[in-house]
């Protein structure tokens, strides 16, 4: 245990005192979805009370969304936010432990598409939903944030926008982005069993249910394979040394840099996949402050 480098809260999490539900399979998916929501609901309620943000359900381009608004709006630009869950679980509500603090810290409204999930709605349903909302937001300055599968979603939407000649966001923040569904990167071997929130088997199951028999090298499925250039916005990527998808963040950062994109890759010692979801951990709070400062630095006057 890296006691000298981790907060007491992070150490407790790594000791499995607060394990998140896991074990994805098609037969148990409904139970896993319910268990995960029950697990995170107390934290969501606590965060909503402490941040004093408000939420309401809206519809944008026929896609149901959750709008998160700070008590005092100080930013004229919205944030398009993609929630995680391997495209087979998760919801806008469950990601409020990240989205609500970001909303309060930036003073910006967040729009979280409630995109359709696999296996009921496999690819390209989620990306279609995300891109529909993207199209409604992109005519004015805006930012994108996505965690895990939500990072995949916002990247894929940006690549679609680039191909269509639509405006790109002014800045994008990606938290442990699942940007490649080919489960063969180095960290997916050496961090399997070390990451308390994600396993290689869970990831393979999600990839199979989401992509089916489609070519996973398709940039709409694995956006790391997309065509990037210097027109892409500045990007902040966060990950941890225990993150099962650490290698994906490293590879994406290198790909973007080689394409002329401004990238800030922040690798947190001893932390795991989307550690920011655990709002009680001081490192998560600091990472969200970093993300908020990054977004405000690129969008605020």
Go through the PLM ranges and name each one:
Residues 1-71, 301:
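A glycine/proline-hinged amphipathic helix-loop "lid/cap" segment
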